[in-house]
Amino acid sequence: MLPVQILKDNAQEERGESARLSSFVGAIAIGDLVKSTLGPKGMDKILISGNPESAGGIKVTNDGATILKSIGVDNPAAKVLVDMSMTQDHEVGDGTTSVTVLAAELLKEAEKLVNQRIHPQTIISGYRRALGIAQESLKKSSIESGDNIRDDLLKIARTTLGSKILSQHKEHFAQLAVDAVLRLKGSGNLDAIQIIKKLGGSMNESYLDEGFLLEKLPGMFQPRRVEKAKILIANTPMDTDKVKVFGSRVRVDGVAKVAELEAAEKLKMKEKVDKILAHNCNVFINRQLIYNYPEQLFADAKVMAIEHADFEGIERLALVLGGEIVSTFDSPQTAQFGSCDLIEEIMIGEDRLLRFSGVKLGEACSVVLRGATQQILDESERSLHDALCVLVTHVKESKTVAGAGASEILMSSAIAVEAQKVAGKEALAVEAFGRALAQLPTIICDNAGLDSAELVTRLRAEHANGRHNMGIDIEKGEVADVTKLGVIESYNVKLCMVSSAAEATEQILRVDDIIKAAPRARAQDNRPC
């Protein structure tokens, strides 16, 4: 029987072993790309965008999610790992590199098993069984924080920051992150924590401000300090709306007509300002521009008017101050005002900002980051954000596990023991899962320039003898009780890392056909030039 073409011309299809090999190669390449960034001694990557002269054109980072988000990936299996890393970053904030590397190692082991003629469904079944064993052993080893949650939060923050650019000042930033998270009082609302980056100074000059900072200033001749502020937050144009919206043109036959038009425009502006002042507010914050004439009217009324607050900033400001963003001013009685005890002007380096103190959302605060270059500030922000996410996750479920490779070897050892009880080819897949987990501490040692074979075998021996808190002391290059060194991690982060990697691997293993649709044909333009 002749083959029948069911796909359009130019559509591409890979089947069976070819499709599986393509998936393995793409996903493993992603893991190899980021594995050199893993651990406290991991290296950084320089990422250059298509236009390196643009703002943010060059990034220096070792954050797995940032690296994978910034590179263009064409392989579909590689895209699965990129999406998985993004999810890990969104859910728990840390472990983005670990989850990618673990998934790549699981696929390497799966590739070996496929080459031994073991069916992918058998591998998936073995991986599922191994995942259950790993999750159970991790749960048994976890410890509740109890009353000493602040100490645990500090240790977790130090561990998280230990592999970041902030590692040299991790004690300072750990205190800063924990103070910020504890102000949230368990709400987990990270929108209440604002991070402001200011060039200049050194990283250890960064600090936590207990007010909300806005990188804007009031208009000329307006109050620079307001107590007991009643704040109206708006997103409204302050010029003549219809002329701007409809792009109207006006033709006049004399200078007097121009003066009449300007007077009419001023009258419309004054009407809008009068409506705003009818709300009896003493502070007006607008997302859009406030022109010179309305600014003068606000100054005459002794009202602080702030213009051009960016959308994200004004959304967060409304949340923090307890107000709502309005766009019309016809019903003052329905407007929800923001409030705070004090608005004042402060200096950070050479820049002036406004600080809102005593805000309605009491847990709100601002972290001011200092640094020598924009790249340092950007990477510091990413690192601090990761730490804040991990701490918020831990506050919700206060369980910790040992870090520095201890948890991975614990799970690997538990899987190796249980694999002996599994019959058939599935046992090979269970053992392979354990070997993949053991690769994480191996890579951490390799990145630190240590003898990974020696250290990991010694670590296995310690765990076989029941000492499950033993991990790798990277600074001394030896096996040690890492809980005594304060190297602990959030149970949720580790659990999410193992589960996500196993699920992504299973999804890729199920693939036996890759179909690329034909490019969309452009309609031919027959119009004359």
Swiss-Prot record:
Classification via Pfam families = Cpn60_TCP1
Gene Ontology, cellular component aspect: chaperonin-containing T-complex
Nucleotide-binding as UniProt keyword = yes
Keyword Zinc-finger appears in the UniProt entry: no
Span-the-membrane segments of this chain are: none
Q: What does the UniProt keyword field contain?
A: ATP-binding, Chaperone, Cytoplasm, Nucleotide-binding
Q: Which GO terms describe its molecular function?
A: ATP binding; ATP hydrolysis activity; ATP-dependent protein folding chaperone; unfolded protein binding
- Which PROSITE patterns has this protein been placed in? TCP1_1, TCP1_2, TCP1_3
Give the principal location in a single coarse category: cytoplasm
Q: Could you tell me where this protein is found in the cell?
A: Cytoplasm
Q: Which SUPFAM superfamilies match?
A: GroEL apical domain-like, GroEL equatorial domain-like, GroEL-intermediate domain like
Q: Which GO terms describe its biological process?
A: protein folding
Q: Describe its assembly.
A: Heterooligomeric complex of about 850 to 900 kDa that forms two stacked rings, 12 to 16 nm in diameter.
Q: Which family does it belong to?
A: Belongs to the TCP-1 chaperonin family.
Q: What role does it play?
A: Molecular chaperone; assists the folding of proteins upon ATP hydrolysis. Known to play a role, in vitro, in the folding of actin and tubulin.
Q: Which PANTHER family match?
A: CHAPERONIN
Which protein are we looking at? T-complex protein 1 subunit beta
